[in-house]
Amino acid sequence: MATALVLGYSAFDLGLFSDKDPRLKLIKKAIRKDLEAMAADGVSWLVFTGSLGFEYWVLEVAQEMKTEYGFQLATIFAFETHGENWNEGNQMKLSRFKQVDFVKYAYPRYEHKGQLRDYQQFLLENTTSSYLFYDEENETKLAYFYQKMKNQEDYFIKRLTFDELNELAENFSEN
């Protein structure tokens, strides 16, 4: 049973502030293509951390593909308090992360930074791969986690990059 941890840029990181942004159609097309390939490679579980942006878009696409491809979806939040201060629209998105096949919380609440380190280590040790929208030239807080992934023995990283999106956009506009 192959499991993939899903992580990537937030909507804010990408400057996408509307669910109707036309760039989302292209991003979701890339996600669908990647998820089809991952399913063919035997990935059956997708594990989320409950972040908005790339993770949420993967969740949306995976839920559409769930019946046909047999994906199982899990959300492992760092804290039970995750997202409690989000606005109503984001609370609705958070609820979708809670309506998956498996939901757990690592800790009741944040107490010290060691919890985040241990949480990340737990995620790495309990997944066999990751699906990551991240480009080293556009660093964010994911840089540290990405380094940990690269150092994890026998850990496969499937990355979606800006170059891939640009290539898809060129082909998309030609058709």
UniProtKB/Swiss-Prot annotation:
InterPro entries: YspA (IPR010697). Pfam families: YpsA. Signal peptide: none annotated. Belongs to the UPF0398 family. HAMAP family: UPF0398. PANTHER family: UPF0398 PROTEIN SPR0331, UPF0398 PROTEIN YPSA. This is UPF0398 protein SP_0371. The lineage of its organism: Bacteria, Bacillati, Bacillota, Bacilli, Lactobacillales.
